């Protein structure tokens, strides 16, 4: 139970507090305290992030591409006030919108639910390769003030799966329309350039750029890594990242807020 209590206090340190919003429905210390007093315990799925050689960290959500580059730019301007820093990074990254070339390998959830041997499952990996504006991997709904339905409304706290959300390369105008949908009750995935999958494992392998954008490889080589947004924390990694969900790995104080009434908010930065 000491481990559980530690995570309760940790949830309020992130930028968007997605875990606090998902567990309590609101970012409110008194509400969280009441859940502890009343003994509300909720099992939660957790992801591991690793390379072929080492474990990187644990987490609940990840973004590669736009979401990660926005955070990386914001971290370089920590001298700015928090709200201004986030708006500046968002607008600057959106103005310089570029796709990431990478290969995604994933194991669909239904494959592991079939009565097959583990060795057969290795042949069931699916792959997609291309240029993506953003790749999101979410083990929980990821509710927050800017996304009342959640960044991944089709997943749950403890159903043993992850939502893989792939945004293909498209125009800036269409991408903004997709982002604005998160702030409403409309389906943010109802676009031809957005693909969603329910998975148990994902491998993300960045590819070096070719053609006119090849000069960006020099900058990436100098930095030695690609940015990742893990629960609002910046992580940099140069090699393939393997994300795996571990069903109901930990117990946290809180409840399942899946049945909360949907609400609408407005976004001041779009």
Please describe what each predicted stretch is.
Residues 1-142:
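Catalytic core of DAGKc-family lipid kinases
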Residues 127-129, 148-270:
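ATP/nucleoside-binding phosphotransfer catalytic cores, i.e., glycine-rich phosphate-binding loops
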Residues 145:
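Flavin (primarily FAD) binding-site architecture
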